[in-house]
Amino acid sequence: MLLSRNLRALAAIHLWIVYLLLEDLLGTCAEGDNQRLVASAPYQDIEITLEKPRVQAVAEPHTLRYDLMALSLEVPGLPQFLTLRYFDDEPFLPYKKNSSITDSQEPRIKDHLRAETWGRETDDLQEEEEQLKGMLAEITAQNGQNTDLHILQATFGCELQRNGSTRGFWKLGYDGQNFLTFDQKTLTWTVDGPSTQKNKTFWKTRAPRADLVKTFLDDICPAQLQRYLASLRNGLLNTGFPKVIVTFRNYPVGRITLTCRAFRLYTRVATLTWLQYRKPVQQKTFGSETILPSGDGTYQAWVSIRVLPGQESQFSCNLKHGNHNINEPAATEAPVYGARREQPPTSGVGSRVGKSLWSAMTTALVVISWTLSQKLMGPLLWFCSGGFCSFLQCW
């Protein structure tokens, strides 16, 4: 039984690591309110020196999220502690227990934060590690699970909404299952799922103090989010001007498909408009749920229209993005009909490796699941939600 439990926990860890890799490199989809597990930050008394951000309306919501994971035992090839931070679902500042290096995957953020601010962020990760490890040790000792492999996960953060207000979220998970959620309105912890009163009391007494969590969600996290947002605004010149490209190809029924692609978008809001004789005929506005990440911290979007052969010169594409207003003609030379024009390669790391990476990572996921389930535990059904994965064994 001990071996079986360890193997099951190890399988859950491998799947969770694969999930993180997919999310980091391919981007994530928008989920419902606070569906991710996050953990740690101020488990102990701290002195608050940050001013509460001034309420100010924004064009689009922004999110700062922390994902943490701690293992009760050392597993070869896996970090015993892992932290990932996300700004608007873009990963940056990974931290692993077995590595003394903490580096940003989003250089625009690091380059424009003061050195002392960046150092404080790194120090916080080490404190969070100790707090999460201590909580995990206490839980396993209380339940007599010291010799088994167990996982404690946490997810917390805050969202800056369009009206300038903020809301926070904080969840804890154990062995792939949600077990504690913080209610920001009542300032209490709730135990997820059915549980005895004794278990509820046990979990609640091990949770971070409500007053410290409130301070983090109401003050510290929004202030950090505002700093990251300001650093991106100050670093917009690093992205260069947005780039607009128009391509065309023959359509089988006597039409030409014009495609307008916009690259190097530094926020998740943009509007693309097709103009005929400088008058709008088709317009699409992209937001956080429809714009595409390029994989390098910028975004991209595209829109197509079908026209009659010979009309290409009548059309142009207009991009409105921040302070930029760019017009690109649909045709600068006579098109060659009868042959499909090759589309230019999409810029950005994510687009260059997206298909091959998705194939490789999907294969890895299948191999891991199949190998572990068939050779070690029998058929399994996997369920993943908000970064937490659980499984049912099929007999």
Curated annotation (Swiss-Prot):
Record propeptide residues: 370-395
| Changes after translation | N-glycosylated.
* Any one of the GO CC terms: external side of plasma membrane
Q: Which residues cross the membrane?
A: none
| Keyword Metal-binding belongs to the record | no
Which residues does the annotated region (Alpha-3) include? 241-337
According to the lineage, what is the superkingdom?
A: Eukaryota
Give expression by tissue.
Expressed in stomach, intestine, uterus, skeletal muscle and heart.
Q: Does the keyword Disulfide bond apply?
A: yes
- Per the record, the coiled-coil ranges are none
Q: Which family does it belong to?
A: Belongs to the MHC class I family.
Assembly notes: Heterodimer with B2M.
Q: What is this protein called?
A: MHC class I-like protein MILL1
